Amino acid sequence: MDAERQGRIWDYWQTARPDSFGGAHARLRHLARRAGRTRVLNVGIGDGAFEEASLALGADVHALDPSAGAVDALRARLNLGERAQAGSAVQIPWPDGYFDAVVASEVLEHLDDATLLAARDEFARVLRPGGRLLGTVPAREQLSANTVVCPYCTRAFHRWGHERAFDPAALRDLLSPRFAAVAVEERVFVTWNRLNWKGRLTAVARVALVAVGGHSAAANLLFTAERA
């Protein structure tokens, strides 16, 4: 799926359906705590939950997203001004070594081969030496499970615009050429207050499964790396 079509999907979810990101809040709050009180760039703003959590922790938070509408809404809600920019991960509009941390949560799986490598290199460019890259991707996703068909053109596509699936080895292979101390772990993040009792029981089972070394379709791969 090309960048224009990806943009259509995410412009819809971020501007017309920001409520759809509620299940991601636990994951985003975790990443905000990991980034800490630093100058941090979040790539892909969703409903702004990461930015809100980072500001509450005292971070100097910046945001980048291809959706101008989502950026305008975030600026208005959190008073970020020029710290929130519309743009691409392959051409980040901040100077070399500007950030202590870059966060990319549920971003990499949307990128084609060339864009993925270019984005990785841009993350490294805007991080200071020793700065940290943090993020998540779906764990071992079966892409076909989320394939849908357009009823107008009959073209099949991934409902969220995912281009690839990752396992820990694939993430390490991607990041190691530009980053040191690459670490990957499988985690289940649960936003408990969004669930009824049945959902909570299911979430407990998923967390327990991953804790004993199993795999869950609801899990994420949490990665951290340092700019050399």
Where are these regions (language model features)?
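A short His-aromatic
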Residues: 109-110
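A short glycine-rich, Lys/Arg-flanked "PGG" loop and its adjoining helix->strand segment in the class I
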Residues: 117-129
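Conserved N-terminal segment of class I S-adenosyl-L-methionine
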Residues: 1-95, 101-105, 114-120, 186-189, ...
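Conserved hydrophobic/aromatic "anchor" residues
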Residues: 94, 99, 166, 179-180
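A SAM-dependent methyltransferase catalytic signature shared across enzymes that methylate proteins
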Residues: 170-186
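Conserved class I S-adenosyl-L-methionine
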Residues: 134-156
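Acceptor-substrate binding/catalytic loop of class I
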Residues: 153-170
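A C-terminal cap/extension of S-adenosyl-L-methionine-dependent methyltransferases
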Residues: 148-151, 182-228
